[in-house]
Amino acid sequence: MSDTEEQEYEEEQAEDEEAVEEEAPEEPEPVAEREEERPKPSRPVVPPLIPPKIPEGERVDFDDIHRKRMEKDLLELQTLIDVHFEQRKKEEEELIALKDRIERRRAERAEQQRFRTEKERERQAKLAEEKMRKEEEEAKKRAEDDAKKKKVLSNMGAHFGGYLVKAEQKRGKRQTGREMKLRILSERKKPLNIDYMGEDQLREKAQELSEWIHQLESEKFDLMEKLKQQKYEINVLYNRISHAQKFRKGAGKGRVGGRWK
């Protein structure tokens, strides 16, 4: 049975149903009498169903219609499945391409990071080399300056030592307090060069100077106490000598007076 015949058959069935619907309200009288005799039903009365008329001389193959509908549904389902798998395949390809791009970008970033690290390492090495070169030049310059200063100080020390020798020759072996102070300062005074020192070395040097100052203060205190003791002893001896000289002067006058008598 072709599609045209199936369509004609469906149109005939529709016409028969319309005819049945038109013929159904032609029997109102018995229904109206029943409605007057008894109360109205709770639900409407369904008209009797009339089977569709099958045209004579033509046999309808329902199995063929069902088979065609199944084939059509199967074809649509197969089309949907094919579209779904095509879409899924496309999405998988896009996902694989996205993963490849991510891995490629990650590798590029790692390469760029490695390149930057190497550049930074080279820059740090150049800076360290330049710093070392400058430190060597500064150390060499400081050494030259120290040598010049030492030479000047040695010359000054020689002249100062000659001056002290001359002063000693003039005054003999006795030295004044000023001369002794100058001599001791010239022996103890040393040049302090801290330009080349780092933070730790400066801290150690400061600790050393602090201990040295503490030692000097201690020695100064001891010397001051010793000086006080010596002054006290000198005063005591001076008083004794003065007292003894008074008695000696009185005894001398008596003897002289005795002679005169």
Swiss-Prot record:
Q: Which residues form a coiled coil?
A: none
Q: Which UniProt keywords apply?
A: Muscle protein, Phosphoprotein
Region of interest (Disordered), ranges: 1-61, 108-152
Composition-biased stretches (Pro residues): 42-54
Query: A single GO CC term, please?
Result: troponin complex
- List all Acidic residues biased stretches: 1-30
Q: Name one GO biological process term.
A: slow-twitch skeletal muscle fiber contraction
Tell me yes or no: is Phosphoprotein among this UniProt entry's keywords: yes
Among Pfam families, the record links this protein to: Troponin (PF00992)
Q: Which tissues does it occur in? A: Expressed in soleus muscle. Isoform 4 is predominantly expressed in fast muscles.
Gene3D superfamilies, per the entry: 1.20.5.350
The UniProt transmembrane annotation reads: none
State the InterPro entries in the record. TNNT, Troponin, Troponin_sf
The UniProt entry's sequence similarity note says:
Belongs to the troponin T family.
The record's note on quaternary structure and interaction partners says: Interacts with TPM3.
Q: What function does the entry list?
A: Troponin T is the tropomyosin-binding subunit of troponin, the thin filament regulatory complex which confers calcium-sensitivity to striated muscle actomyosin ATPase activity.
What is the name attached to this protein's record?
Troponin T, slow skeletal muscle
The species this protein belongs to is: Rattus norvegicus (Rat)
Coding gene?
Tnnt1
